[in-house]
Curated annotation (Swiss-Prot):
Naturally occurring in which organism (per UniProt): Caenorhabditis elegans
Induction, per UniProt: Up-regulated in the intestine by fasting. Down-regulated in response to a high-glucose diet.
Enzyme class: hydrolase
PANTHER family: LYSOSOMAL ACID LIPASE-RELATED (PTHR11005)
Name by which UniProt lists this protein: Lipase lipl-3
Keyword Signal attributed: yes
Length: 404
């Protein structure tokens, strides 16, 4: 889950503010932001087995030449979280953003976009204006989107494997796919870097916990009546909130920050406050209401179940009345590096220690990195993240790729 959810509360407060300053990046796409900072940007598309057309963004190299022993660059793939997009990895200044840091280190950087977000709104046969376009959750992202994007990247680059860095839902989909892997997919992932890793979300805190426990029945009822649809798309209202509140007077920008902290965890001392309007203008990037229902089901269930269609439909789909659980104990063959924090209210410490760490085989956990003061968004937007997380990952991948 990502900073996009801040806009859920902010949009109702948006009013015109003559003092607000508009950053040009508020209205740019990911490739435009990349090019604004002097980096090359490329766009690719891939079609999933169930017909969704996903857009991938690529930074093929940085501003300096880096020579690799075998003549080929290492490939890193970055996957956003819930309600987010490829933009998340580029929204800070270049020396603070993961995508640019890896590009300048000589990596071929690829940024994924899951179905239903700003950049992945197409299907071979379905239209986004129709309900059937939105009948999916992260189940389908893990089953279809993730392997389709990974295979496309490897096809274009001519590599056999890549380094994967995911945040929040971007870790959940990888864990889930690996748990059902027959051994072939795992060989394509050299190393899996899990930022704010998500398994169970039973013990989440803050606004989302309150929503899941006290308003989920109302949300379910709305979903039952109106069916599948789009949830929190990136539109003019969100950009208005980003500009006029997050980019307004100090009292208003502080309000913007505090709403975000209500969702992500305690107030952060490592945000670039001048970039908050940019964050809020690109997130939320949209998802399906059915995906939100699936997350609510996870809060209620306390584990990582497949989507619950109801006992009758579950029997048709799964052969049993209750949805099956993803078995994280079955994950093997990929080295995993965990990055989590006591201050993260979404990838909660209790969920990680009581669920994730008790199920992942210790043999595949290469590193278990614990921070005391990172909230959920700090792993992507925090000013200490480059030194604490990104550059150490660059070093790990560089040594691995060079065979050291």
């Amino acid at each position: 889950m990502c900073s996009s959810l801040c806009a859920l509360l902010l949009v109702i407060l948006a009013v015109h503010n003559v003092h607000a300053k508009s950053d040009p990046e508020l209205h740019m796409t990911t490739p435009q932001i990349i090019e604004r900072w002097g980096y090359p940007a490329m766009i690719y598309s891939v079609t999933t087995d169930d017909g969704y057309i996903l857009e991938l963004h690529r930074i093929p190299h940085g501003k300096t030449n880096v020579t690799w022993p075998n003549g080929k660059q290492p490939v890193v793939f970055m996957q956003h979280g819930l309600l987010c997009a490829s933009t998340d990895w580029t929204m800070n200044l270049p020396e603070q953003s993961a995508a640019f840091i890896f590009a300048d280190a000589g990596f071929d950087v690829w940024l994924g976009n899951m179905r239903g977000n700003t950049y992945s709104m197409k299907h071979k046969n379905l239209k986004a204006s129709h309900s059937d376009f939105w009948e999916w959750s992260w189940d389908e992202m893990a089953t279809y989107d993730l392997p389709a994007m990974i295979d496309k990247v490897l096809e274009v680059t001519g590599q056999e494997s890549l380094y994967y860095m995911g945040h929040s839902q971007g870790t959940l989909t990888m864990f889930s796919h690996l748990s059902k892997d027959d051994g072939i997919f795992a060989k394509k992932i050299k190393k899996f870097f899990a930022l704010a890793p998500v398994g169970s979300v039973k013990d989440i805190k803050g606004f989302l916990s309150f929503f899941a426990h006290y308003f989920s029945l109302e949300f379910d009822g709305w979903f039952d009546v109106f069916g599948a649809g789009e949830f929190l798309p990136n539109n003019w209202a969100m950009k208005l909130a980003a500009k006029d509140i997050c980019g307004g007077l100090k009292i208003e920008s502080d309000l913007c920050d505090n709403v975000c902290f209500l969702i992500a965890g305690p107030e952060s001392d490592q945000w670039n406050s001048t970039r908050v309007p940019v964050y809020a203008s690109h997130d939320p990037a949209g998802t399906a209401t059915q995906n939100i229902v699936h997350w609510i089901q996870m809060v209620r269930h306390g584990g990582v179940p497949a989507y619950d269609w109801g006992s009758k439909e579950n029997k048709k789909k799964y052969g049993q009345a209750n949805p099956p659980e993803y078995d994280f104990t079955a994950i093997k063959g990929t080295q995993i590096y965990l990055y989590w924090s006591d201050a993260d209210w979404l990838a909660d410490k209790t969920d990680i220690t009581n669920y994730l760490l008790t199920r992942l085989n210790p043999a595949i956990i290469a590193q278990n990195n614990y921070f005391t003061d990172y909230n959920h968004f700090d792993f992507v937007f925090g000013l200490r993240a480059p030194n604490d997380i990104y550059l150490p990952i660059v070093d790990i991948c560089t040594k691995d790729y060079n065979g050291k």
